[in-house]
Every structure is written in structure tokens, then in C-alpha cells.
């Protein structure tokens, strides 16, 4: 039951999905959506619904509805029916129909007597109101999609048309859906109108029903039609403003027919001979490639305007009808027109079957259709697909067998002992001079580059073309391409039948075939012969006089119409302003650049021949509405922009409305509220932040206001002229009238007040004031020089050291510090500047708000206030003195009085004490003495207490004598009692203790009493001051708590880093101990996966491999599995067990998989290969998926110092910088020379090619664990020796006997070689500069080398620790590719910028020091200094041509080195002249090295763009403004110093050096290089050829001259000779495929790939198993194969990646962080079958 329910549920779901995805439902949905695309056409329908009433009103409603529906039906039909769509979509038809109709409709509704027929009946035909309502709704529904931009919902219909098979059903259903939506909309409108009529509150409005407004309401109802027409007109004008009509567009001047021939790659396939005229496909654009033939003189050129057709008179047929950007193609000098999709579907034959090609040339398909319509006999009969496929497969099988036989024959010839040079297939080259053996350049060689070749020839100027020139050259000008497209014919027989043809015009290059030539096909029918006669009679010439045959030409006159072609070679308005356009370019700009004006700021008049001008482009501050669009283009498809301000700087679409600052009513930002609440808790710096924010907002508002004022002056007519004259008049009035009058008035007043006049000081300040004329944007010129075109462009007047009238000048000698400070302040005010306004005011910036002048009367009022203050304070000082003296006298009197009272009381007490008798007890004299002493003490203490009590109550004793007597009596009693108590206590003590003890205890009691009294005093003082102490403690505690809280994150992070550091160090130390224990018991195992990082003095620098350099990618390709050698400890201890027969096969297989040893006795069983997906492997490395922002956080500013301070091995002899530089230069020179000579070694090339093949092996994973790695084992010895030989390594003879490789034998320093030339050969000696990969070395483990004692740091690789001077290199994948080490180390700090910088610019740093040849200075780059730069910036074709020139000039250098250098410079200049376009004649002048370098870079490296640093740009402009003034001054010191003090001129960007190279500008951060996407059509065939043809072996590489051999022997050291003499198994690298040429090799590979019958493969990803077909072959296991190892190595199977270009492009995405948007398919691997040995 559950199964049945689920089955029913599944059926229901599938049924629902089918219904939803059906054509009818989707059509209804899209039709319903188009209802909401409400446009101006709805205005007529609503007006008919609202306004018209009665019987006529109902008819109008019906007619409006029917017209509306009919118009929408026509729109839907036009989607399906192409002619109707073209008729409605033509811009001239819409313009002709729409604009007059709109005009007629506007006048009809606004003019009362326009169509007034008087009283007519309803049935008369003259009443056109109902018909007009129908037409209005019909026509405006058609206009809505074409003349007015429609909604996006209406365009969704066209999207679904590509997916839908039954298009008519979709159109019908969408119309029905629209009809349903329209009916619902109309019903809703009717309900709204009924609700308005029935609502009494609206109808019973007092204002509407009042008598005052009845007339207005009636007028409003009568003129409703006029209001609707006005609304319609406004909407139409608004829409047409964004999409101008073609009738008002800009007409471009027609370019002459003598322009360069341009076109696409299909049109460039021309012969190598010069073609002075274009071919029949004269137009470069594919769409307009109709037949056009050359005519001597055309009658249309002399036609009057009324004789021309109406369409060409009104409309510009050369108009660019889309808002296209103009992109110039450097190679063919034509525009890139991409109006269509890059995919064009058409049927073609592929693999012998009719298939749909998605990149078919659209012009070819349209031409086929035209020919088939015009000539019925041209249609071919369709043959069965099986017949075609079998015939095609037989031909390809035959070709494959022939190639296989040829390859086997060549291999057999190699076995017989033939030389390799004779066996290898040579590339066929075209030569144009057999005696000198000069070949064509490779870019023009048809045997190398196929269809991508082409030579562009310029026609002579139009004035030179005459009739004689045409008649002389007309014979060889017609290169007909149609015969190659239509049918295959035998051209020799065809030339015999048509004898009057010129043989040169129809001759085709004969292809070379290694086997039999293709069979000649005959013309089977007479119809085909008629076709070719029809096509070729047009250019049939007479053999005698070579004149055109007029008879056939007149018959073919209809086809010679002028083809509408686009005008190209347009220049922008900016280029016109800069004045750098070319000679043959029209002066009128055709591109709308950003609105700007060219302002000349300096002219050099010293040279009489030519005037150099320095100019700046002043751009308008408004939004750039032009956006580099071609003039005359219609902008209907531009993004919709809305303007709501008078001057809007940043216009944007309403889509981005949420990004602008909105009002509080329209936005509720919760995050902002949270921030405000949290900010309120922070009480510190709250006010300061508010003030800063207010100031920033105020500055933004002020800047916006200034821009608006500047734009208003610049936009209105004659505004700049009026402003300029006003400024000059204000300047003259200020300088010569107002200020002198003020000086006279001031000094005359001083004289009247009997003060010394200050004529000299005032006149000195007045003369110092300068009125400098500036450009409109503030560039200073001089006092007398006006800027060019200042009346139209505008002017500013800057006042330097403005004069301010002062009431007096202070004296020079002011000693006090306060006076000095005032003086510096006054000096700063003097050095200030200001700009003059129209009203004579002063502003800090142009068009800024007026600033306050220092007031003349303010210092006077200050001085008066001071003096009045002094006068007021004099009488009060006398009174104060008297008061102070009176208070002192009173105090003295009080003190005397108190002293007298104290003395009188003391005398009285003494008298009483003396009058009392002394009681002497019956004891010894000693005891009496002691008792007397105690009594005295007690009396003194009592006396003190008594005195205190007397002091406290002295006032009471004065008042009453009775109280005094009582107190005295009480005191006496207390004393006597106290004395008695003391005596009793003492007696008791004496009875128990001795006399000495008694004396000691009494002293203790007395000290205790004293301490207690002191404590009492201190306690009272502490209580009094405790309040302040508590406050102080609270403050200190709060400060300490705050500091502790702020230090918590720092402490925790520090503890965390220290803990992680210690943990990692312990972990590393333990691992190292384990590995050392294992390595003591085992031998060296050469395997790449066990590479250990170099550790200097127990230091581990964790260089992160996240940089993903090129070397790392290759390293990961070669590393497949990691073996765990700890499990094989017992096996690895003995080498005997490896070759033993008693070891298990599993262990042998494991060792064989890892490539540890040669296992020769085991049978070779080959594995089944699987497709390893490159992209999935890259995706698995998730750590490389970081965004660029995360990488940017790791960048440090001092990475350069780290790189320069790094060193590999410290050599104590290299102490001086000079000796190091010299040695470095010698080593680099030797390495470069040795590398250049290694190029000529064929063995080196074979080894290099085999390294690439090794990585191809490694890129495949094995399905079985049994994997033959004999290739990697055999590579070991040769690769090690080649690496040591190449890099000049000493002591290599001992490497075989050493367990580890010592770094000290290496003499190359990776980190200190900043110039990359020794590692990447940029001196044009190599063809592949960036992709050069040298032979690598398989190293197992490197020992620790003892360097200087350094601390162990975890973050050392980031360059954060400056104290590290010699960090070691731990990434040993660079041992295989040392060229890429510097790239990778810098790539880790700046992973998206540094590789581009280093690859392009670092070779500029290498400058030859030991130059012994003296040369004359030329205007071009010196050959030795910047030769590498020149060759790098040239493209590869020119570089190869320069290689040949350089190799040929080597012989001349020995004979005459100076002449050889000059010749070499000439050839370089010739190459540069060909690559660079010709400038105007007045611009041909000598340039500096930096200018030429920049030009070369910008022309050749079109994939990158240079831009200024944004902060640096403003600094340069400020400096330029000051420079322009300083140049014109005789003594500029004062103004220069003042401008530096004001901050106008920054010293950090001054040009101290004369010649700044581009690399230095990059390092300083002045120029920034960025990748940019350009729509330049790259030479795809050339890229494929160079990528796949890596192993190209040329003939000249096998020849080594004698002098090269001698130099090689000299350069080889004794250690290198040991490595060279070692046995090298070069045959192991050899691939049988390399015998064939690259072209034949590709053909052989493709033919093998076509045979897909017996191939078995599976994808590693299981989800693709069902979809992917068989792609690879499995090696056939044959029993008759020889098991001898040498033969197996010779006929080893070879893996070839079928799509290596995709592999490299995918890797390139990770090297340089560049993507081109293509989706790369997986790598498909093909394996050759093994050849049997006879």
C-alpha cells in the first residue's frame, strides 16, 4: 500500500512538473507578465474609458479596446514572423511613420479648428473620431516596443523562443495570457471608476460644487484630450532624449577607398605577393561582405542632392546603430564589431557526418543561402550519412596507415645506423631569395601558421591613383575566393578553358605532400561550369591590352552598388585635443570622449624649428554621459540613468538607490543604531569625533558647491568672457587703485596723530604682492602671460603674498619669546595666498567661499583695551597695599596679646607650686632621690595638662572668677589623688622588683606614652587627609584597571604565539630526531616526496606553499603518493634484499611504484590508465581558495629589504660591495653565455622535452598499484648531472659518494640575485622566456648547514622580523626550477602583483659595467643597456626575426665590433619602426629612454594597463602648478621656499635622477600595473602551435660552430667536465613522435584519435561514468615483445595530453590569478600503441 501511494505521489509530481514546464503554461505565464509592461499606449485606452460617455463613448471604448488588442496581436506575430519584425524594427520606417503621426496628433488635439467639419451625422464617413481612436491604440501599441524602450518583462518572451520547439503554440498561448491579464486590468479600472462615481464624499466636495470653481471644472473636463496629448508628448520626448532619432544623429564623413584593407581572419588569407587593391570582399565586416568591384570613377560622387535616394539623403547608412565602444585592433587597423553572439549555429560536415557547428562563419552561411536562392542548380543532393561517414573514415584510415608506415620506416632507418639529422623530418619553409637563403618570417610562412597568416598592404594615397595605374595593376589584383568556397575543381584545367584569365590572379600555392598527391576532381556537369563562368566573367581580361571587358561589366552593373561600410580609424575628442593623431586619420573626431578642454601650460620657444607644448586636459566635473560612444550611435540600450539635480557628479541607475544616503523616513538602519548606542558608552574622544565628522561633511558640501559654481560659469554662453574681464578689472583696481589709496590714507592719519609714517614698509609689502594668471583649474603661469584661449576656457587670478593694511609695523628687535612666536605667525600669514573673485573678494580655493581679511582696526582696539586696563588697575593697587599692611599689624597685635596672657598664667601656677610643702617618707636617701624625681615628672605632666586646659578655657576664666576657683580646686584634688596613686603603685613595684629593674620599666612606660601621643597626632592628621587619599587611590585603581584591560589582548596574543612557537619547535625537534634515527640506518633513497627543508642552526622557517608558484604546480604534478618508510625499516637496512629473489612480490611492487629501484627481472605488466581531472585536483587544495583581501593582510612593506638581506651561504671573502658586484656580473655573464650555447645542443633539447613528458606521465593516476616508474629512475643520473652542469656547481664529482648534498658547493645565490637575467634569459637568446623550465634534480634529504646563530621565529617567511639577515631556503621544489625562486619568494608577499612586475620589469636592473666599446649616442635606446627590454617588449615574431639578425651579426662583431653594434642598432630601429605606427611629421623628434620604453610597453603589452597612483596624481598636479610659475621666474628661490612651506610642492616626488626607467617608477609606486581585459582577437592558431609544438627541433640547432665549441670548453669547469663525461642514457628520453615535424605530428595524433572502436577508459569521478565516452586506448599486451631493457626503453609507450592548452591555461589561472572565463574540459589522455620488434 505504501509503495502504491508513493507511486501515485511520484506520478502526480511528475505530472505537475510536466504541466508547469509545458509550452502552453509558460506562454500563459509570460503573456500574463507582459500585461504589466504599461507604456504610453495605455494612455489612449484609459482616456477612452474615463472621458467618453453616451452612445458614441461606448463605440470609442470598443474601438480603443479592439485597436489595443490588434496592436498587441501584431506584436506577438512579429516575434514569430520575421518580415513583420524587420519592417517594424527598421529605424527609418519607425522614424518616418512615428514622428509625423505624433506631430499630427499633437496639433489635432491642441488646435480647435484643425479638423472641424461642422455638423455631421454619425453614419457619415467624414467623422474620423472612432477610426482615429482605433488607429491611436493600434499604432502606439506597435511603437511601444521600438521607438520607446519597453519593459524587461516584454523581452522575456524572446528568451524562451530559443528553448521552445513549438514556437507558434508558445506565441498563441502568450497572447492568450496577455489577453487574460488585459481583461482583468480593464475590469479593475472599471471597478475603480464605478467606485469613484458612487462615492459621495468625492462627488459632494465643496470646492468642486461651489460656483467659483464650476467654470474651472468644466474647462478641465473639456480640455482633457489636450492634457492627455501633452502628457503623451512629454513621455515621448523623455524617451527620445535617451534614444535619439536617426534623423538627428551625427553624420560621419565618408572615408576614402584608399584605406587599409582590414578584416577578420577568414578575409586575411591572401597570397604572399603584394596586392595593391583589396579583394572582392572589400568590406572588413562580415555582415556587409557583399560583392563589390572597383570602378574608375563613380557617377554618385557628382550627383546633386535631389538626385540621391531619399533614404541615403535623410539617414546615415554608415551610422553605428548601437551604443558601441570603439576598440582599435593593432594588427589589422579595423574596428572590432561584435553585434552578434560569438556562437553561430549552422550545419557542416564533421567526422564525416552532418553536424551543427556553433562557431560557423555567419557571412558564409548567408552567402550559401543567397547562392542557393539565386541559382537553383547550385543546390546539392543530400547523400546518406552512412555513405559519407564510411567514405570519410576510409580516407582517414588510409592517411593514418600511410603516416604509420612512414614513421616505422624512419624508426627502422634509425636502427640501421642512419644519422638523426637525416631521419628527422624537416619543416618546409618558403624562401624569397635562394642565393642568400633568406626565408619568410614565421608569421608570414603558410607552412607554419595555416589560415592565420595574412599580410596587410596599404594602398597608395587617393591622389596618386590614376587610370594608368589602375590599368597597369588590374591584372594581378583579383584574387577570387569564391571558387575555393563553392566547389573543388582542378585549377589547371580551369585555366586552360578560360585562357583570357591572368594566371597570376588565379594561381594557388601548391601544397607539398609526403605521399601521393590528392586525386584531381573533374567538373561533372555543365551546370557547375556555367556557375563558374558566371562568376569569373566579371573580371575576365583581354590577354593583349589588359583592359576591362566592358560588355560583361555592363551586364553585371546591378551588383556594383556601393556597399554600406562602417567608417573606421576614428579618433576620439581626447586624441584630437592631445594632437597625437596620425597622418591619414581624419581630423574630425568620431568618438565622444569625456568633456574636456586642452589647457596649454608651457611652450618652449627656444627652438625655432618646432615649438614644444606642455598641456593638461581639464575635464568637466559633470557625469560622463558620453562614455567613449561613437558619434551618431543610438543609446536606447544604455543603462537607465535618472538625473534629479542641476549638477549631478555621479549619475547612476535607480537600481543603486539603496547605496546612496537616504532620508530617515526612507531608511531604518539597525546596524547604525547599534553603533550609535555603543558609541555613547565610549565617553573619550566623543566630542572630537563629532567635530571631525562635521568638518568632513562641511568640506564635502563646500567642494560640491565649488564644482557647481565652476560648472555654471563653464556651461553658459559668454559667461567665461564676462568673468575673465571682471577678474582683470578687479585685479587692476586692487593693485593700482584701492591699495595705494589705503596706504596714503593710513600714513596721512599717522602724520596727523603725530606718529612716524610707514611709507617704506607699506610700499615694500605692496610691491611683494603678485597677481599670477592661472588656468581655469589653477595652474600658475606668470604675472604677464595669459593662458591660451582664456576668453573661452576661463581664467583664474592667484594673489601671492597678499597685502593687508596694518596700523603699524613692529620693530625688528624683539627679544621675548612671545614676540618671536607672534613674528612666525605673522610670517605664515604673509606667505599665504588667495584667489581673486569676481566681486573682489579673496578665497582660499577657486570658487570657494570668501575668507575674512585681517581687520585694520582689530589691533588698534586690542591696544586700547590693554591701555584702559592698565589705567584702571593703578588706583586699586594703592588700596590693596594699605589693606595688606593693616592686616599685618592686626595679626602682630593679636600674637603679642596671646603671649602676655600665656606668661601671666604660667607665673601664677609656678607661685602656687612653690608655696606647697614637700613630704619626705622614712626611707633611705636613695629612695628619696628617686621619689623626688618621679614627683617632678608627674608635676611636669600635670602642668602640661593644666596648661592645655587653660588654653582651651581662657575665655571662660575672664568672664567669671567663681568658675575659675572651682576649677583650680578640682585640679589640685586631681593632682593629689594622682600622686597618691602613683606612690602606691611604685611602692608595690619596689617590693617585688629590684631598683635596677624599676628604672628600666619606667623608661619603657615613658617611651610607650610618647609613642602613643605621636600616634594620636598622626591619627588625627590621617583622618583629616584620608578623604583626599581615598580619591587618589580610586583614580589610580581605575587607571590601572583600564590599562590592564587594554593590555589583555596583547598579552593573550603574545602568550598564544609563544605557546604555539614552543609546541611547534618541540614537534619539529621530535620529528627531526626520529628522521635522523632512521636515516642513520638506511642509504640514500632518491625520491621526490621525502625532500626535507634546509635548517640553519636548528631553525625552521615555515615558508607556506600557498603562493602556488609555477614550480610548486610542477612539483605537485610529479608527486603522486607519499610512502611511509617507517614500515619498511627492516627492508631498507639492506640493499641486498632489493635484488633478492626471495622477497615477496608485494614489497617489490611497492618499491617499483615509488620509483626507488630498478626492478629488471619482473615482467612488465602495463596498467589501465584513468582520466585524472585536473580541475578536481586543484579544487581539493582548499587552502589556495583565499580571497585577495586575506592575502593582502600578509603583505609587509619591507619585503624588499628582506629579499636583499637573504643569503644562501655566507662567504667571508665577499666583504666589499664592489668585489661582490664584479663577481656577480661575471657569474651571470658566464651563465648566460653557457645557456645560450646549450641551446644549440640537441641532447639538451631532447632532455628538456622529456622533462615535459615526465610531468605528463605524472599527471595520470593508476588504477592498479602496479605502476612502471622506470622512466623516473632512469632520469635520475642524467638529470642530476645536467643540473650540475648547467648551473656551474663545484665539487660534483663527490656527490655519488656522499650521503647528502652540501649546499656549500653551490655558487649561485638565489635571494641576492635581484636581476633575473642569469635565471630567466631575457636577452633574446631563447624563444620561450616565461615558460622556460630547466632540468631538475631529484634529491632525497639535505643536511643542516651551520650558519650564524639566529632565533627561531615562526612568522619569518612573512618578512616580519627584520633582525634575520640570512634566512635559509626551505622550498626545495625550486631546486628543480631555480629560475622561479625569486618569483615565488616575492609572490608570497604580493601574490597578485609581484609576478607581473618581476616578469615584465626586473630585467631593466641589469646594466653592463664592463663596456669597452665606445659608441655614439643616438636618440634610440643603447643596444647593450636596454637590449633585453627591447626584445622583451617586441612580440614573439619580431623577436625571432631579431634572433636571426643577432646570430648573423656575431661574425661581424669579432671583425669590427663598433660597426657591428651600429648595424645592430639599425636593425633594431627598423624592427621598432615596423611595429610602431607613424606619427605626424611635426611629432618626429628625439625621445628619451623612458618615453621609448613606455611607448614600447604600452603598444606591445596590451593585456596590462598603467595607471597613476591616486594619491600621487594630486601631488604631481600640485607640483606642476608650481613648476609652471617657477619656470617663468628669474629668481624663483623665494617662491619655491614659500610653496614648500605651504605644502603646495612636495619634495618626495621630485625628479632627482635624469633617466628614470619604468622599473624604478614601478618600485617607487608612481606607476601601477594592472591586468585589463581587452577585446583584441589573439592569434589562436599561433598559441596552439607554440604550445603543442614544444619539442620542435630545427635544423640550425644541430650545428655548432668551432668558436662556440672552444668557448664552451673554456667555460666548463673541472667539476662540470666530470659531469659531462659521465654516462648519459639519452635514448631513454627519446620519443618516436619527435621524428615527424610538428605539423605532421598533430595530424598523426588527430587521426589516431578518430579511431574510437577499441578504447576503454573510465573517469575517476563516478558521476560522469555514464556520460563520458571512451577516450583513451589501453596498451595492447603482446607476448612477442622483447624483454630486453634497452629495447623496452626504445619502444616505450608515450602519453600525450590531447588538450595540453587547456591544461596550461588552467594552471595559468593559479599562477598569475588570471582567468579568461572559459570552462576547460578535463584532460583527455591518449596512448600510442606499441610497435612490435622484428
Curated annotation (Swiss-Prot):
There is a partial copy of the N-terminus (positions 1-302) of ycf1 in the inverted repeat (BAF50510). The keyword Transferase does not apply. The gene is TIC214. It holds the Pfam family Ycf1. The chain crosses the membrane at residues 19-39, 68-88, 91-111, 133-153, 176-196, 227-247. Keywords: Chloroplast, Coiled coil, Membrane, Plastid, Plastid inner membrane, Protein transport, Transmembrane, Transmembrane helix, Transport. It is found in: Plastid, Chloroplast inner membrane. Part of the Tic complex. Belongs to the TIC214 family. Residues 1433-1485 form a coiled coil. InterPro entries: TIC214. GO terms for biological process: protein transport. GO terms for cellular component: chloroplast inner membrane. Involved in protein precursor import into chloroplasts. May be part of an intermediate translocation complex acting as a protein-conducting channel at the inner envelope. It is a multi-pass membrane protein. The lineage of its organism: Eukaryota, Viridiplantae, Streptophyta, Embryophyta, Tracheophyta. Disulfide bonds: none annotated. This is Protein TIC 214.
